[in-house]
Amino acid sequence: VLKENNIRCWGSVTLMLDDRNLVAKDEAQRAKSVQYTKDCITMVKELEGYEMTIVPGTVGKINPDGTPEEEWQWAVESLKECYEWGKKEGVVLAVEPINRFETYFCFYGAQALALAEAVGPDCGVCLDAFHLNIEEADPHETIRAAKGRLVDFHVADTNRFACGQGHWDWAKLVKTLKEIGYDGALTVEFVAPVDRTPANPYPDAIETDPVDISPEQKKFIEEHGSSLLTEEFYSWQVEECAKTLLPLI
């Protein structure tokens, strides 16, 4: 389908739900999570993609299982196994930090860079504009610090709507990416928040009769404060991202 529509797969991202956790105290749980990640890496290879973005811990888990030293060791060991699998499959790994309200383990850029460096010379990082806005004192310096290891960049505005609908200065952000020589994907990852009150400016945004959606996918979307969106609303959000970013790149 991708080839028929002249679309290239850039990569994918792990959905770290339920018991998926590369820094879990339980060894069997970590092993299961590593296998899931390796399966995702193989999927990217089969789609002829380039990179696999990995969130180390369970999304939504904000309480640690062990000491900082223990969890760092578990993370490095787990990711090293995934890293070696990625090298075998020809897929580059990217560690993604997500904000402190979604994880306790790796939530800002310097942590992701330190983890990538501990894993291997070709292990990269993925940064996300939405999370950068929450966690970084200077997001542009964080991007500059990732020079040479940045292999994916997720785009959504400060309110997690489409680019241009929050207060990110996209011209400045794209300029910073160009400064460090980044020429990879700008992966659209808006998660439009759903307003369930009478103040909702987009009352027709929610899809009331969804098809082809697994319970896991639905759970992931809803736990991010969003919902299943209508095709019209989703397409509009994608178009807004394109309208904002394409003139800048």
Predicted region positions:
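Aromatic-lined substrate-binding rim segments of carbohydrate-active enzymes
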Residues: 1-6, 11
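Short secondary-structure transition/capping segments
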Residues: 1, 17, 22-24, 64-66, ...
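Histidine-acidic metal/acid-base catalytic patches
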Residues: 48, 106, 110-124, 133-249
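Residue-level detector of alpha-helix boundaries and kinks
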Residues: 18, 25, 67, 97-100, ...
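Active-site beta-loop-alpha junctions enriched in small/polar residues
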Residues: 14-17, 57-59, 91, 98-100, ...
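Short phosphate-binding/catalytic loops that engage adenosine nucleotides
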Residues: 7, 91, 182
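Active-site acidic/histidine proton-transfer and metal-coordination neighborhood
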Residues: 4, 23-124, 216-220, 235-236
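Conserved beta-strand positions in the central sheet of alpha/beta enzyme cores
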Residues: 11, 53, 94, 126, ...
